[in-house]
Amino acid sequence: MVTLMNTYGDMFRVTVFGESHGKAVGAVVDGCPANLPLSEEDIQKELDRRRPGQSIFSTPRKEEDKVEILSGIFEGKTTGAPICSIVYNKNMRPKDYSKIKDTPRPGHADLTYRLKYKNYDYRGGGRASGRVTIGHVIGGAIAKKLLSYTYNIKIIGYTIKIGKIEGDFSYYKNPEVFENEKSLERLIEIIESNPLRCPSMNEKEMEEYVLKAMENKDSVGGVVEIVALNVPVGVGNPIFNKLNGELARALMSINAVKGVEIGAGFKAAEMYGSEMNDEMYFDDDKNIRFKTNNCGGILGGISCGTPIVLRIAVKPTPSIGKKQKTINLKTLENVEIEIEGRHDPVIVPRIVPVAEAMVAITLADLMIKGGFIHPCSL
């Protein structure tokens, strides 16, 4: 298993690089088989989904996030060589962070990075910034293309809760939406046209919740649900390399994610076994079917053929306008801090494409390791 702290994956490996206010960010993807049709447009459309400044609910930092592929592509297809992609930072304002050099911001990684590494790029959070997830999305875009090309796998994420406001749409409330192509296309249209990436009818109530927090110089969190469709039976391994364990590890690598649920999740603790168990039957063509999907597409750490259903808890953006108490590491005094800069009042909608990316990278890695996808050439 790869243990490098900036690399994720064993066979399909994604190494992310760069800092929030450095020259550039990006990713190197190693282990993608040759002959996969891939273009900068395939990556750009995913990056555009996480790009800042697209609504009043995201940071006003203006970045075009234009990707450039430097290697690994020839005549429109992958060669099997490492795919290096870079995005240059354009709208940096490092002076916004000069006041926090010695005063770690509550809720951020400032303190732990400073104590561990001593020489820490504190500008905008450096390596701990959400901007670094551009690398995740680059890797995820390539993984998505690979999964779609080989198995028609679709990965769809959306917001189901903002703060205390729970939406009326989710996989378990509306499973029929995921059963045909037309309803899926319509769902994606609704998600992508909404500033919170929420397909619920009560989404406006969520918007008001965020606006109220903004008025109070505060921020909010929420819950994102991710559904992976058409994943074949047999992906994953028992015991220590379970599919659910690998997916949870991948999703927990995303900044601001504080919890992961799979299938019925924590509600399973409230259910009877007779309610939780997904009963099986043969359809008319003798295919194995399940009456329910409380397992979330995974049994014993291995995919069972039903949709894989995951949810992540996203904490409120830690950068807020309110005065907060902290410490000065240089003077050893207790001080107050008022954070300047450009920040998201809610990070939830921009985490959606990042979460999809990490699910895709995990599935691609496990499917290459498991023999579902040839490691050298398609």
UniProtKB/Swiss-Prot annotation:
Family the UniProt entry places it in: Belongs to the chorismate synthase family.
Keyword Flavoprotein attached: yes
GO CC annotation: cytosol
Role according to the record: This reaction introduces a second double bond into the aromatic ring system.
Positions contributing to FMN binding: 127-129, 255-256, 300, 315-319, 342
InterPro entries per record: Chorismate_synth (IPR000453), Chorismate_synth_AroC_sf (IPR035904), Chorismate_synthase_CS (IPR020541)
A GO BP annotation: chorismate biosynthetic process
Assigned keywords, A-Z: Amino-acid biosynthesis, Aromatic amino acid biosynthesis, FAD, Flavoprotein, FMN, Lyase, NADP
One Pfam family from the record: Chorismate_synt
Cofactor note: Reduced FMN (FMNH(2)).
Lineage: Archaea, Methanobacteriati, Methanobacteriota, Methanomada group, Methanococci
PANTHER family noted in UniProt: CHORISMATE SYNTHASE
Catalytic activity as recorded in UniProt: 5-O-(1-carboxyvinyl)-3-phosphoshikimate = chorismate + phosphate
Pathway terms, separated by semicolons: Metabolic intermediate biosynthesis; chorismate biosynthesis; chorismate from D-erythrose 4-phosphate and phosphoenolpyruvate: step 7/7
Required co-factors: FMNH2
Enzyme class (EC, first level): lyase
Listed SUPFAM superfamilies: Chorismate synthase, AroC
EC number: 4.2.3.5
GO molecular function terms attached to this record: chorismate synthase activity; FMN binding
Protein name as catalogued: Chorismate synthase
Residue positions binding NADP(+): 50
